Amino acid sequence: MKKEKEHYVNNKDFFEAMSEYKEGVEKANNTGSARPYVSNYIGDCVMKIATRLSRKGNFRNYPFIEEMIGDGIENALMYIDNYAPYRIDKEGKEVKGNPFAYFTQIIYFAFLRRIAKEKKFLYTKYKIMENTEFHNSKDVLDDTRHQHKIEHNDYSQEYISDFIQNFEQTKRREI
């Protein structure tokens, strides 16, 4: 008999842990006592989700992957109180929530926000480099003592130009 593959996050146990946490938060809010800490198990599940999501093909090769994971974990913990263990569906029936899907979605969008932030930073950096090269080439003509030209090969210059052009086109489409 084939052994069933074990998931890195057991959704049933994760649901139980989140239900306990939410009950503790509700109890603390009603009595005015201190809020419970997020359990190690919940934190471990959130870390596993963020780490495994970062290994997907569309996120894997970014150089700022650690920042993406950190943002994902931070956002998941920031919105942990919005998780509802039970909700009412369209027919009026009570349905169990899915903490794995909830936190995966939060982390996914945190990754997208980090990528957008890093692309904007890279765009700014490349525009500064482009403007600096222009002004420095002008300086070279005026005075040969002030040569501060940044060296690029043809590939990197082409990549930078394409990146700037694509970024600006994307921004124009958003408007």
What are these regions (language model features)?
Residues K117-K138:
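Short, basic/polar amphipathic helix motif occurring as a linker/hinge flanking DNA-binding modules
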